């Protein structure tokens, strides 16, 4: 699945050189935690494509590619939330409709600035 997103906020985290990118992707919101020495922080308003796939080769076509596992699939109020851990860096998908990702499911996450 490819999410076409727009960056709405960038916030530094307590861990040095790590930042959180908040995006809006149509009817979903994505938050990504990234390290500035690996992925340069985008600017607010930047368009990015986030690919979530089971295919490593598809992921490798992106500017950034990592793999990880779904660690949480919950509903908080009327928002469904899936958390994918990229070995400690988190990707959070928020939606008003249930998401079909299962806990411990393996994914590759690709990010490209468009």
Which residue ranges define each predicted feature?
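Mixed-charge, low-complexity intrinsically disordered regions
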Residues: 1-80, 85-114
């Amino acid at each position: 699945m490819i999410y076409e997103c727009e960056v709405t906020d960038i916030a530094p985290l307590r861990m040095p050189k790590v930042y959180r990118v908040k995006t809006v992707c149509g009817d979903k919101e994505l938050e990504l935690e990234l390290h500035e020495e690996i992925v340069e922080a985008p600017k607010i308003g930047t368009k990015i494509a986030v690919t979530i796939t089971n295919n490593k080769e598809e992921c490798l076509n992106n500017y950034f590619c990592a793999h990880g596992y779904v660690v949480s699939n919950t509903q908080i109020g009327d928002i469904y939330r899936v958390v994918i851990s990229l070995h400690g860096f988190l990707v959070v998908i928020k939606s008003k409709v249930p998401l079909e990702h299962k806990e411990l499911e393996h994914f590759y996450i690709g990010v490209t600035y468009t």
